[in-house]
Amino acid sequence: NLITRDIRTQRDKKEKWASFKHEHATELRSLLELDHTDMKNPGTLLGFDIDEERGLILLNYTGQAHNELHDIEGGWSQPLREMRGLIYDFTTEVPTLVSRGFQKFFNANELPENTYDALREKYGDREYVAREKADGHMIEYFMHRGELCASTRGKFGTTSSIEALSMFTADKFSEISE
């Protein structure tokens, strides 16, 4: 609601986002659980896209977040990990979650919590399988007001998300997503 109160169109985003993220730095730092850092402008970690026609906002961490947060202890806070393709309908009185992508996850040894020693400590002698995380392209399918929609984790209306819609009908998607 903090963002969509003032920014509801692509034009608003273009004209207002730079000043908005500076004006609301303290609120954004708190929202992203980064109060323990000296990060001056946490708004640079947050990206979003707007689908004006459907009244949707898609939230995602930015490339800058990906590059900077590995070097900050506790930088990948839980809200930032979950802010990976979150889609809200902002036409409702309180923004309503429509879809959420996969939570951010990491390669083995990419963060201290994902070292093999940390995994052994966490899981003990229980057997677990660790696989390499391959880079790829995430398409997020979701139903909104009876319509099958698709996006990437950071943008509406991309070529790949439009092409992805040709793979399913709303009925088929509903059938396999149950």
Where are these regions (language model features)?
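Short beta-strand scaffold segments in enzyme catalytic cores
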Residues: 139-142
